[in-house]
Amino acid sequence: MTTVIYPGTFDPITNGHMDIIQRSAVLFSKVIVAVAKNPSKQPLFNLAERVELVQLSVVHLDNVEVIGFDDLLANVVKARQIDAIIRGVRTTMDFEYESQLAHLNRLLTNGVESLFLPPTEQWSYVSSTIVRDIFLHQGDVSRLVPAAVLRALEKRAK
């Protein structure tokens, strides 16, 4: 059984994230989506809300588990005996940054590899930052996020 972890802040989870999760769920026995509390970011949704939104978005995927965490990713990887770390990469800038993290995580986890998955073309431009920006400027994000996220955003706008 191969267990992978897909960490991120997911603020909010987008259809680009869902693309990576769904494809990972086909490739691996178990996928843990790890929603991070990042003190250096000011989130639109708090950690508990983000965990719930991811859970609602992946409910149809039997081999996907969602957790929240505020620890070093390497500690979570070791504690849960994770086989690999999944990272989505859209651009060469993403790849350079993620390569650095992959080297550090390999060192801190005694060899756990990071696997890079590019999103399918239709989601290559989507990011949580872009979704938040469009939403905060009253734009339509309905085609960019799962239904649960759209409902939460609409509720937040009222």
Swiss-Prot record:
Site (Transition state stabilizer): 17
Cellular component aspect of the GO annotation: cytoplasm
Known cofactor(s): Mg(2+)
Pathway: Cofactor biosynthesis; coenzyme A biosynthesis; CoA from (R)-pantothenate: step 4/5
Residues binding ATP, per UniProt: 9-10, 17, 88-90, 98, 123-129
Family: Belongs to the bacterial CoaD family.
Oligomer and partners: Homohexamer.
Name this polypeptide is given: Phosphopantetheine adenylyltransferase
